[in-house]
């Protein structure tokens, strides 16, 4: 996949390519009880094209590199692939530390700069015991950009002196940790480079800055939405876009009976669905309108948590469609705020600030007042939720 545009560019004048709708092919294969394999798929596609007059094709504009969509898509997919490798290496490192340096996780958060910096110089508990406190402090102090106190170093040494890890650790265990640390550093460098490329390409699209106005939508998430959506005009309405994002509910109907499962269809782009879900995770905590909707649907029932999340993701997908279609930024409307309970309104206005520097690194959002005037604000009190 993702190479059709290159094939298309290499065609002669008398040649053309048509793209089959994969859902249509899957449904046709299932209806004829044909197994799934590459040879059988080729035979199935050949049979469909030759015999079925109702065959469904995809608009070939989807695969054109117009406005850099395909370049951005390739970068986003590569970022997801490397991020997955990064998570795997981190998990392997934590597993090794559980055996050779368990005390470190009680002082520094795994994946943190301090955690990696300590392991790069002192891969085991006994390396710390034999080290200088001031030397360890200087390493951590530099890695955390001067945000570390000596108290944490003292706590680390105190825990290490009471360790249960034997002192006869083989050199292989130490070398595995050092190798994992080096791999993680390399992967982080690759991620930063790709993120820079993604921002450069995505910023050329006018929808990029508009999407950043959605509560919880960061630079990488906005770039993913643009890459996976392409030209918003190819969707007839918001329902079509929601269906493509895979956030639409999956219901079963038989006559007048409707079975509501509270699950999503998971059709379309999984990258787009993940991006929308990440936006929804932040928005349900900090956007007052969506927060109230989430709490109303959940109604204190833990079993309805996922159902409420799906509802918020569905709402976010509709916001995205409206923003990209109308080329307008997202604004929390005054009339929507005034419908909320007083406690929710108070919590919202108590967590934002209208006074912030022009060069702030925080995400800037908007809400309207009773006169329709739009005000920009930043959040000052946030839970530990990342905007990516």
Language model features with spans:
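Phosphate-backbone recognition surface of nucleic-acid-processing proteins
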Residues: 144, 210-213, 219, 223-301, ...
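Generic structural signal for well-ordered, non-transmembrane alpha-helical segments
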Residues: 80-83, 87, 182-192, 314
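Amphipathic, charged-and-aliphatic alpha-helical interface segments
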Residues: 109-122, 184, 188-198, 220-232, ...
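Short helix-capping/linker segments at secondary-structure and domain boundaries
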Residues: 53-57, 89, 126, 188-195, ...
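Low-complexity, acidic/Ser/Thr- and charged residue-rich accessory regions of DNA metabolism proteins
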Residues: 256-260, 294-313, 317-388
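Phosphate- and other anionic-substrate recognition elements at nucleic-acid/protein interfaces
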Residues: 1-158
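Helix-hairpin-helix/helix-loop-helix acidic hairpins
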Residues: 160-220, 284-291
């Amino acid at each position: 996949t993702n190479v059709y545009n290159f094939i298309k560019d290499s065609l002669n004048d008398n040649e053309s390519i048509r793209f089959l709708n994969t859902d249509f092919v899957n449904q046709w294969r299932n209806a004829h009880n044909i197994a799934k394999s590459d040879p059988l798929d080729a035979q199935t596609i050949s049979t469909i094209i030759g015999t079925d007059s109702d065959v469904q094709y995809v608009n070939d504009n989807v695969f054109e590199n117009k406005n850099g969509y395909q370049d951005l898509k390739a970068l986003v997919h590569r970022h997801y692939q490397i991020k997955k490798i990064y998570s795997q290496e981190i998990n392997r490192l934590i597993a090794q530390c559980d055996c050779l340096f368990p005390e470190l996780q009680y002082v520094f958060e795994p994946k943190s700069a301090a955690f990696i910096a300590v392991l790069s110089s002192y891969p085991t508990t006994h390396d710390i015991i034999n080290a200088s406190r001031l030397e360890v402090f200087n390493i951590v102090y530099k890695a955390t950009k001067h945000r570390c106190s000596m108290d944490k170093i003292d706590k680390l040494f105190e825990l290490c002196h009471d360790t249960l890890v034997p002192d006869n650790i083989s050199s292989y265990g130490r070398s595995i940790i050092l190798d994992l640390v080096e791999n993680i550093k390399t992967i982080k460098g690759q991620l930063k480079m790709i993120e820079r490329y993604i921002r450069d390409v995505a910023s050329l699209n006018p929808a990029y800055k508009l999407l950043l106005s959605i509560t919880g939508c960061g630079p990488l998430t906005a770039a993913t939405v643009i890459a996976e959506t392409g030209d918003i005009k190819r969707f007839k309405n918001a329902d079509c876009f929601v269906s493509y994002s895979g956030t639409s509910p999956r219901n079963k109907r038989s006559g007048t009976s409707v079975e509501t499962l509270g699950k999503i269809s998971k059709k379309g782009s999984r990258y787009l669905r993940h991006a929308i879900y990440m936006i929804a995770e932040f928005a349900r905590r900090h956007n007052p309108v969506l927060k109230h909707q989430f709490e109303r649907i959940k109604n204190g029932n833990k079993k309805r948590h996922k159902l409420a999340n799906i509802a918020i993701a569905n709402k976010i997908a509709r916001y995205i469609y409206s923003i990209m279609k109308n080329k307008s930024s997202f604004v929390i409307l005054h009339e929507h705020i005034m419908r909320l309970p007083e406690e929710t309104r108070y919590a919202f206005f108590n967590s934002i600030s209208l006074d912030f520097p022009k060069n702030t690194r925080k995400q800037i959002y908007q809400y309207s007042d009773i006169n329709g005037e739009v005000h920009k604000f930043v959040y000052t009190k946030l839970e530990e939720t990342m905007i990516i």
